[in-house]
Amino acid sequence: METIYLLAKLPEAYQIFDPLVDVLPVIPLFFLALAFVWQAAVGFK
């Protein structure tokens, strides 16, 4: 269990990017939502 935690934790040098890494997995969902809104705007052609 401790090994998994060590692999999941960013190295010390990259700690400043920790909040960014927490947000990155959500970005594809925004693209999915954008595609839906775009298709709704053009009438689902």
From Swiss-Prot:
GO biological process: photosynthesis
Pfam families, per database record: PsbK (PF02533)
Signal peptide: none
UniProt key word Transmembrane: yes
InterPro entries xref list: PSII_PsbK, PSII_PsbK_sf
Topology term for the membrane: Single-pass membrane protein
Localization, UniProt: Cellular thylakoid membrane
Coiled-coil ranges (or none): none
Function in brief: One of the components of the core complex of photosystem II (PSII). PSII is a light-driven water:plastoquinone oxidoreductase that uses light energy to abstract electrons from H(2)O, generating O(2) and a proton gradient subsequently used for ATP formation. It consists of a core antenna complex that captures photons, and an electron transfer chain that converts photonic excitation into a charge separation.
NCBIfam families on file: PRK02553.1
Subunit structure: PSII is composed of 1 copy each of membrane proteins PsbA, PsbB, PsbC, PsbD, PsbE, PsbF, PsbH, PsbI, PsbJ, PsbK, PsbL, PsbM, PsbT, PsbX, PsbY, PsbZ, Psb30/Ycf12, peripheral proteins PsbO, CyanoQ (PsbQ), PsbU, PsbV and a large number of cofactors. It forms dimeric complexes.
Protein name in the entry: Photosystem II reaction center protein K
Organism of origin: Synechocystis sp. (strain ATCC 27184 / PCC 6803 / Kazusa)
